[in-house]
Amino acid sequence: QLPSEADYAKAAKLVRKAGRQLAFATPRIIKEAQLAYFDKLFTLWEEMQPDFVYINNNGLWPLAKKHAALNLVADMSLNIFNSQTLQFWQEQGAAGAVLSPELTMAQVEHLVSVSPLPLECMIQGRLEMMVSEYCVGGSFLGALDKGACKFNCAEPLFLGDRKDARFPIVTDQFCRMHILNAHELSMTANVQHMAEAGV
């Protein structure tokens, strides 16, 4: 289910009340028919004056740039591995960039030393392994084949493998199924090192 204007306003109010930075993010898969929706959504976000908007799809960048008040960040799914990519996103007007989680600490340090942009890294969380239009929850538990899904997307759902690993399944606002890694990425031991490096 797509968030309403009231949902976004409520979230923004809670964030501001907590004294935190407000940031919105886009999905990494955008269909042609969804471009108009995001164009309107950027207008709404601009009115809310977020600190940053994280862009995960190349096609959304030109739409977002039309809204000059938005500080756009090239997010992790844009595969930022090298200095040329950072230079490209600076030329596109990015306010910052999120590095690929596949980089080594030495590679991160090098990019920080040559980057024209402020950089971020993912520190804690599960990486996405797969995304699909096919929804396991809706198909098996929500009677999706009857025409209207009754599955509660907030209900915890997992896939298991032969080693008994549990892969969390989450559903986005467009009913896409996202399968996450069974193990969390954790760089908490390197937080101080990263901060000293300038991330």
Label the predicted regions.
Residues 1-88, 92-199:
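Active-site pocket-lining/capping segments in soluble small-molecule metabolic enzymes
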